Amino acid sequence: MAATTANPEMTSDVPSLGPTIASGNPGPGIQGGGAVVQRAIKRRSGLDFDDEVEVNTKFLRCDDDQMCNDKERFARSDDEQSSADKERLARENHSEIERRRRNKMTAYITELSDMVPTCSALARKPDKLTILRMAVSHMKSLRGTGNTSTDGSYKPSFLTDQELKHLILEAADGFLFIVSCETGRVVYVSDSVTPVLNQPQSEWFGSTLYDQVHPDDVDKLREQLSTSENALTGRVLDLKTGTVKKEGQQSSMRMCMGSRRSFICRMRCGTSSVDPVSMNRLSFLRNRCRNGLGSVKEGEPHFVVVHCTGYIKAWPPAGVSLPDDDPEAGQGSKFCLVAIGRLQVTSSPNCTDMSNICQPTEFISRHNIEGIFTFVDHRCVATVGYQPQELLGKNIVEFCHPEDQQLLRDSFQQVVKLKGQVLSVMFRFRSKTREWLWMRTSSFTFQNPYSDEIEYIICTNTNVKNSSQEPRPTLSNTIPRSQLGPTANLSLEMGTGQLPSRQQQQQHTELDMVPGRDGLASYNHSQVSVQPVASAGSEHSKPLEKSEGLFAQDRDPRFPEIYPSITADQSKGISSSTVPATQQLFSQGSSFPPNPRPAENFRNSGLTPPVTIVQPSSSAGQILAQISRHSNPAQGSAPTWTSSSRPGFAAQQVPTQATAKTRSSQFGVNNFQTSSSFSAMSLPGAPTASSGTAAYPALPNRGSNFPPETGQTTGQFQARTAEGVGVWPQWQGQQPHHRSSSSEQHVQQTQAQAPSQPEVFQEMLSMLGDQSNTYNNEEFPDLTMFPPFSE
């Protein structure tokens, strides 16, 4: 029973096991007490139901509490997870933001270091603090605080203010001006505004910049001068990049000190006269730029396009106070524009002077040694009209005037001998329009540095278009070289107007003393009274047959413009009577008597009758005396004179008889005889003391040469030794061909044969410059024939 009673408790405790046990005990003991059990079960059935409800409710409460706890726990875990995620995300975002910020700052500082010159010049990359410090120093230097003293004046290191100003204005080709930003009043303008705008400084001082610009540009100028943020509206064109930007992007910088201004406006051009000295190449460019806006109507102002660039500066500067009478003094601190105005280069096609200024006047060509074109500059089309392919492979002589072809050939031969030196020659060039253009060609040779051989000749051909320059006349129309004296070595293209003043006076003096054939009718000598003589000889007018040997370049390379200028067609016949009276053909011996007398000493081998010795004018004696003193003493020998003992003689001139046709005259001076292809002569057109002498022919052109002697040998001019007489050293080994027999031409031949006398022409020029000296017998100790006289 106890067990039975215990079973219900057990069943009550575990209700799910009660029915199972009751139903699972069909034994008699259980069956015998089944009623009780059933009753007990029945009796407690309600209680069992309540217990089950209570047990169920207990389990439900436990489940609810557990679920609530789980929910709370899960809720707390979700909150914690979300907060942790938020914190993690926040930390990640902050790190990312900081990393991006550091990257941006590094990029900006790197860009700043590239912009600062002191940073970029360092060998290794500086740290950020150094970059910032150098950037601040650079900004201070840009604002001028680094080079200004306490009074605010600029102190350059090595230039003064005036030198710096002139250098800046010359380099910029413009003018400097300072304008008040508030009122537009011109504070300062440089004097270079006159050559740029043809306006004096006085017109700018006291006026405003608005008065100087075009009326349509006043508003734009006011916007550029304004420093307020709301002054500009709309969009702004950046001249540097060519992009259109909104003004809001730059408005914050308009009040910044040192902000840059760059704009284009039209300024009024004045009519003041410009100094001719300042009319240089830049002035031509200015005139071309001024014409860029088209033609100017009568009575209307002329405007030109000016590009203004500058910076906004504080005015007055720090530490500088304006005077009380200044109208701007009471307005307090303000700003001003410091800018440079330059003429904007225009490319307007309607410029009338573009064709004249921009048309090239020269071109470069390359030739071989024969003168054939191997390269031609493209500017030859505008200069001479030919295309480059039309000139390539052709000789430049083919385009030269026939009278100048020999001159051009000789110049090419001469430039080859000069080896790198520049040689200039002037000739007439045939253009494509069949016109003759005066061309000045400056040529030099290019040598291979390894083989030292001449590769080609480079020529710069310039078209001379100066109408005031007279063309070079032919040789037949020029003054004879023998009369020009020291000016004979000048270029043929130079006229008498181009000679130095001293040489002009020298030339006029000699021309007065040696008159032409038109002015030789009356010539009175102070010592000898002579009568007019005349002669005619056909043999003396024969042309020179070997002029090319006479004027070859190997005679004297220092005079390339004298010898090549004589062409074959210009060599005319000349008679021996064309020798001027003031020039000596050769020197005589020292055995002349002091008084003039019939020339028994001169014997022409029976061909020449006795004639009268005529004393020439004093200038010839002076010239020959000075030439003889400066001759080379190294050539002196026993029968010849040295530079210290050789006296100078005037020419003792005798007439040549017309009957001497087969051989030239021979002169006997005591025992001194020499054969010559020419004869000395007295002054034509002057009276002589002898009435039976033959007459000389009239003077022909002086520009040609003496006829050669038939059958003469090359050694015909070699002097023969004699007693008490000497021979000029330049006659030894001399060629048989001579030009007009003047002392200057003999000196040239002497120089060609005596290289030890390189300065004889310079000495001769210096000697002939002053002819005012007085010569007497003291200067001629070996002569008694010259009485004291003064010129």
Curated annotation (Swiss-Prot):
Primary localisation category: nucleus
Ranges where the record places region DNA-binding: 88-128
Location of region: Mediates the transcription activity and dimerization of the AHR:ARNT complex: 167-171
GO BP annotations, alphabetical order: cell differentiation; cellular response to oxidative stress; embryonic placenta development; negative regulation of inflammatory response; positive regulation of DNA-templated transcription; positive regulation of glycolytic process; positive regulation of hormone biosynthetic process; positive regulation of protein sumoylation
Compositionally biased tracts (Basic and acidic residues): 539-554
Glycyl lysine isopeptide (Lys-Gly) (interchain with G-Cter in SUMO2) crosslink residues: 58
Reported effect, residue 264 to D: Impairs heterodimer formation with EPAS1. Markedly decreases heterodimer formation with HIF1A. Significantly destabilizes ARNT?s heterodimeric interactions with both NPAS1 and NPAS3. Compromises SIM1:ARNT heterodimer stability
Start and end residues of each stretch annotated as Disordered: 1-33, 73-97, 465-508, 530-554, 631-667, 682-715, 730-791
Biased segments, Polar residues type: 1-14, 465-490, 498-508, 631-646, 653-667, 742-756
Location(s) in or outside the cell: Nucleus
Record's function text: Required for activity of the Ah (dioxin) receptor. This protein is required for the ligand-binding subunit to translocate from the cytosol to the nucleus after ligand binding. The complex then initiates transcription of genes involved in the activation of PAH procarcinogens. The heterodimer binds to core DNA sequence 5'-TACGTG-3' within the hypoxia response element (HRE) of target gene promoters and functions as a transcriptional regulator of the adaptive response to hypoxia.
Subunit structure as annotated in this protein's UniProt entry: Monomer. Homodimer only upon binding to a DNA. Efficient DNA binding requires dimerization with another bHLH protein. Interacts with TACC3. Interacts with HIF1A, EPAS1, NPAS1 and NPAS3; forms a heterodimer that binds core DNA sequence 5'-TACGTG-3' within the hypoxia response element (HRE) of target gene promoters. Forms a heterodimer with AHRR, as well as with other bHLH proteins. Interacts with NOCA7. Interacts with AHR; the heterodimer ARNT:AHR binds to core DNA sequence 5'-TGCGTG-3' within the dioxin response element (DRE) of target gene promoters and activates their transcription.
Name this protein carries in UniProt: Aryl hydrocarbon receptor nuclear translocator
Species of the source: Mus musculus
Lineage of the species this protein comes from: Eukaryota, Metazoa, Chordata, Craniata, Vertebrata
Gene name of this polypeptide: Arnt
